[in-house]
């Protein structure tokens, strides 16, 4: 009998699929669960086997996610609008591991639980087939055109126990938590406080607290004076920033497939790290470097959002981002206060900021030299306007 490898989270969608694939496609099911955040791997494995999976594979990939994926996003100041790409960034890692496990176990089918309305179906399928075009991808929710109500009814009819996980649909990893469904889909209503688990809404926060982040070659290397690996810094900052109201993103999002959606995210650590990194870049890189980098950063972010992590152009951009971050070393001090990140100090051995030159109280910079610069700088614009005005009068 053929086998299908199911990317299994333990939630409603993928729990229903274990039975559905066996029943509708006459395949044995092997599940793959990746811990990218807070997954209880043993509990999920036990559940998959009870549902009829012939094997349940679990992998803890949090450190790999931080070191090989999040690190590249930090270099690239990865944002899609306001969104730090937390879910989008995890999908290529999941696809990579799924292809590897499928090849090791001679499995020719990979199934995922994404709907036909979202971005993840694209991210999974492009990534999987970019890595191995011989693997066939199965998308039961899309192919069966299932709604959440359909899934619940199927689970009930087949005695599939699904733990109630509240009124919201949640996806989380160490870089962020996305919240969908329920009242969030009504854009004329405020998001209820019960949607948030990582971030205390700003109105309930205290007097704030300072944080200090040191960067080495564009990546965080210490937090509040303590050296840590990137994963540990992210874990600690999720707690510190979250209790100070940092990281709630509430936005109208333009999905890859052409739909508008109301998206709510909690990304406390990501918000702080990306803000601090950008402050440091602005201190160290010159105007031309920043201009080029801003363009590449935006292009990089759109590629990740659109599921093109394994496109060859990404490798070229990653090389540029690594090169442009080689001097992004220094420290950034922020005060986290009721949802705000206030810069309280920044320094770097590569800083281009010259206090003696910019200070209005000193005479280091000869202000008179600006006159000659302006005369040359304005020439093209002034001449263009003069010529056009003269021609307008003639006609």
UniProtKB/Swiss-Prot annotation:
First-tier enzyme category under EC: ligase
Annotated L-citrulline binding sites: 83, 119, 123, 169, 178, 253, 265
Catalytic activity, EC: 6.3.4.5
One of the record's GO cellular component terms: cytoplasm
Binding annotation for ATP: 7-15, 113
Domain of life according to the entry: Archaea
Record carries keyword Electron transport: no
Disulfide bond positions: none
UniProt: L-aspartate binding residues: 115, 119-120
GO biological process, one term: urea cycle
HAMAP family the record matches: Arg_succ_synth_type1
Alphabetized NCBIfam families for the sequence: argG, PRK00509.1
Family in the record: Belongs to the argininosuccinate synthase family. Type 1 subfamily.
Stated name of the protein: Argininosuccinate synthase
Organism field: Picrophilus torridus (strain ATCC 700027 / DSM 9790 / JCM 10055 / NBRC 100828 / KAW 2/3)
